C-alpha cells in the first residue's frame, strides 16, 4: 500500500454576500377617525322638541352656567331616548382626551347638533336583534338565561357596564331560580 498523500482540499468558495434586506414596509397609517362636521348638520327637531331637550339638558348642569361637561353628553343623549355607544359619543365629540372629557364644557346650542347626529344614526338595535343576541345564552331553549351569566356578560363583554349599572338594569328581573325571561327583559330595557 502506498503511503497516503496529503491531499489539499480546495479552498471553499467564498460564501456569497447575503442579499440586502428589503426595505421595511412603511408602517400602516393609523386609521383616520371620521370626524363629524356638526356645523353641517341640519336640525330637524321642532321648536317644542328643542325646548324639551333644553330642559333635560339643563337638569345636568351642575354649575348654573347652562353648560355640561363632555363626560355628561352621553348621559344626556341617553336621557333623551337615544342609545349611542360610548364610541359613538366620543366620535360626535371629536374624540377628546380623558382630561378634556372632564374639563371641557358645552352649551345647549353646541349639544343640539350632536343629538341630531346621533338621532339620525339608523344603526340602532331592534327588539329582534337583542332577543337573538340573548338567545345564544339560552342553554335550555326555554326563553330564559341565567341571571348570573347575564350579569357577567354585561360587565365583561363589549361596552362593559359598571356593577351598579348592571344591578340597576336587572333589578326585579330574576325569577325564584335566578333566571331571566330575556324577551320580557328586552321589552323592559327598550321601554326605558
Swiss-Prot record:
Cite the residue spans of the region called Disordered. 1-34
Q: Which UniProt keywords apply?
A: Methylation, Motor protein, Muscle protein, Myosin, Phosphoprotein, Repeat
- Per the record, residues carrying N,N,N-trimethylalanine are 2
Q: Where is the composition biased (Pro residues)?
A: 17-30
Q: Which residues form the EF-hand domain?
A: 48-83, 125-160, 160-192
Q: Which residues carry this modification: Phosphothreonine?
A: 69, 85
List the molecular function annotations (GO) for this entry: calcium ion binding; structural constituent of muscle
Q: Which domain of life is it from?
A: Eukaryota
Q: Which PROSITE patterns match?
A: EF_HAND_2
Q: Which residues carry this modification: Phosphoserine?
A: 71, 97
Give a Gene Ontology cellular component term annotated to this protein.
contractile muscle fiber
The family database entries (Gene3D superfamilies) matched by this protein are listed as: EF-hand (1.10.238.10)
| SUPFAM superfamilies recorded | EF-hand
Q: Does the keyword Phosphoprotein apply?
A: yes
Its GO biological process annotations read: muscle contraction
Q: What does this protein do?
A: Non-regulatory myosin light chain required for proper formation and/or maintenance of myofibers, and thus appropriate muscle function.
Give the quaternary structure. Myosin is a hexamer of 2 heavy chains and 4 light chains. Does not bind calcium.
For this entry, the protein name equals: Myosin light chain 1/3, skeletal muscle isoform
Give the source species: Bos taurus (Bovine)
Q: What is the lineage of its organism?
A: Eukaryota, Metazoa, Chordata, Craniata, Vertebrata
Q: Per UniProt, what is the name of the gene that codes for the protein in this document?
A: MYL1
Amino acid at each position: 500500500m502506498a503511503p497516503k498523500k496529503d491531499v489539499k482540499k480546495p479552498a471553499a468558495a467564498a460564501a456569497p454576500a447575503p442579499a440586502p434586506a428589503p426595505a421595511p414596509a412603511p408602517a400602516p397609517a393609523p386609521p383616520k377617525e371620521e370626524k363629524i362636521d356638526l356645523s353641517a348638520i341640519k336640525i330637524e327637531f321642532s321648536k317644542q322638541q328643542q325646548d324639551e331637550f333644553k330642559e333635560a339638558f339643563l337638569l345636568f348642569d351642575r354649575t348654573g352656567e347652562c353648560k355640561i361637561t363632555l363626560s355628561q353628553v352621553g348621559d344626556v343623549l341617553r336621557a333623551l331616548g337615544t342609545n349611542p355607544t360610548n364610541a359613538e359619543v366620543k366620535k360626535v365629540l371629536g374624540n377628546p382626551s380623558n382630561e378634556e372629557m372632564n374639563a371641557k364644557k358645552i352649551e345647549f346650542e353646541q349639544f343640539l347638533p350632536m343629538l341630531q347626529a346621533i338621532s339620525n344614526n339608523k344603526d340602532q338595535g331592534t327588539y329582534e336583534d337583542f332577543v337573538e343576541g340573548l338567545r345564544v345564552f339560552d342553554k335550555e331553549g326555554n326563553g330564559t338565561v341565567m341571571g348570573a351569566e347575564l350579569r357577567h356578560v354585561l360587565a365583561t363583554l363589549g361596552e362593559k357596564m359598571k356593577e351598579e349599572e348592571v344591578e340597576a338594569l336587572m333589578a326585579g328581573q330574576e325569577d325564584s331560580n335566578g333566571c331571566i325571561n330575556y324577551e320580557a327583559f328586552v321589552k323592559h330595557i327598550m321601554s326605558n
